[in-house]
Amino acid sequence: MAAAKGIAIGIDLGTTYSCVGVFQHGKVEIIANDQGNRTTPSYVAFTDTERLIGDAAKNQVAMNPQNTVFDAKRLIGRKFNDPVVQSDMKLWPFQVINEGGKPKVLVSYKGENKAFYPEEISSMVLTKMKETAEAFLGHPVTNAVITVPAYFNDSQRQATKDAGVIAGLNVLRIINEPTAAAIAYGLDKGGRGERHVLIFDLGGGTFDVSILTIDDGIFEVKATAGDTHLGGEDFDNRLVSHFVEEFKRKHKKDISQNKRAVRRLRTACERAKRTLSSSTQANLEIDSLYEGIDFYTSITRARFEELCADLFRGTLEPVEKALRDAKMDKAKIHDIVLVGGSTRIPKVQRLLQDYFNGRDLNKSINPDEAVAYGAAVQAAILMGDKSEKVQDLLLLDVAPLSLGLETAGGVMTALIKRNSTIPTKQTQIFTTYSDNQPGVLIQVYEGERAMTKDNNLLGRFDLTGIPPAPRGVPQIEVTFDIDANGILNVTAMDKSTGKANKITITNDKGRLSKEEIERMVLDAEKYKAEDEVQREKIAAKNALESYAFNMKSVVSDEGLKGKISESDKKKILDKCNELLSWLEANQLAEKDEFDHKRKELEQMCNPIITKLYQGGCTGPACGTGYAPGRPATGPTIEEVD
């Protein structure tokens, strides 16, 4: 057995599932847990007698929803009044309380109420992963690399590190999930010439797009974009809402307020979603779901795709943003890599493939395991593994925001530009603004706006003792130096005297949240017009798609048989199908094209629908109140004579 001190593990701490790997004997082993599963649910449950972690916790969730905690990753490193926390709280069956501005999860454990910080919940999941690795290796393990989404801010990274410490781990480094996946991918491919790789990571709870350049074993992150709140859970939510409505229609009962019923339904929905990645239909059978009523139903892949259409299409926006940030055309991307269980959804793959003009997607890495695989390799590198496979690998990350200082008139002068590779060091010469100025105030900011008042102040310090001289004569050398962990050192030195002063800006100085980073980037004037155009385009696209789907369901309704001629019905269905196919191939068309296509469809449908209503109403469809643009499943409206 190898000496314990020489072994380090890689942990993918996911929102919904976690995974652990170890690099030994020249290859990565992804380690199965005690249930034989290679991924473990990021769930912790508390009962009257015990604490359960992983599969055991998830398996009993329907019976004990209030005391089963998941999604700790959505809380970690956030304040209680963070809008993300406030909106998520509405969806969780467990209770979140405010303690000194920080969120804590309140549960009943062994008969008494206990409150846990998110770091504590995450540390329990990490402990489970640590024990899984120890059972496989046969000795204790303390060293680990843990991954986080690329957009996690410093407090979220620090809190994740704290969770590792609570779990008894020595956290060697926190690395980005897409970066970890890139390492896995780089090892699989071997470095032959420069390649641009787009990593599309759609997991259970977060979505990240990263563009990397891999050249001869050197990885460079060119750009990252994403959404901290998009993933498999959101697709589950759409299915849950769909079936809650169906139950209401069939049985005239609302189950949405019954936490246990919703939880059981959610479990069945997750299973159905997975089935739909390989089959075109999935059946749900839930005995005694609510008030003794059995719920047996089914859903097709097409209906699932329709329910999540906007979410699926929305995954292309961060792809476009990352390409813009990397100043790269989509034709320049050599490989598209799928990471995260949700990338198994055929529609997601199809949209991405269409966007890249039918290019093949790289699915050679198991999407659930790629991140842990890369983390395990990085752990081996940090432990000094001399294996030929890893020794030439070098990893470069990027700064998510520009860093600079305030110059005369409150202007932001950036020394390190957004998306610069880190570690990095930049030096610039500044001078005094007035005659005989005895000192300068160095104020360090991060952000994309032209004026410092619109950016985020990270810290400030004075450099004094400058010899009297006319303005513009003294030479003050300012150096910005970021290390591999994102810690910034700013030094100012008067070149005539050699006198210097410095400040270190570390992770715990309350850096920006992802939302603020996004706000500052999007607020920047140059993006305003572009954002507006994009919003209008998406609204027009959605309007066209929903109108086409509505028309299809109106004319296909059984209750309208005999009210509409087969030729009219065929005409509408053919036109709708033609437009939906066009949409498939042109998701990124212009607003005017979408509007034009919708008007075209309306001009064809309106006379037929009007004729339908003027024909009177005697059949079973009487009173269903169909109208152009109204969903076929809309509310019943009584007809007035």
Swiss-Prot record:
Keyword Chaperone: yes
Function noted in UniProt: Molecular chaperone implicated in a wide variety of cellular processes, including protection of the proteome from stress, folding and transport of newly synthesized polypeptides, activation of proteolysis of misfolded proteins and the formation and dissociation of protein complexes. Plays a pivotal role in the protein quality control system, ensuring the correct folding of proteins, the re-folding of misfolded proteins and controlling the targeting of proteins for subsequent degradation. This is achieved through cycles of ATP binding, ATP hydrolysis and ADP release, mediated by co-chaperones.
Subunit structure: Interacts with PRKN.
Protein name per UniProt: Heat shock 70 kDa protein 1-like
Family: Belongs to the heat shock protein 70 family.
Annotated GO MF terms: ATP binding; ATP-dependent protein folding chaperone; heat shock protein binding; ubiquitin protein ligase binding; unfolded protein binding
Keywords for this protein: ATP-binding, Chaperone, Nucleotide-binding, Stress response
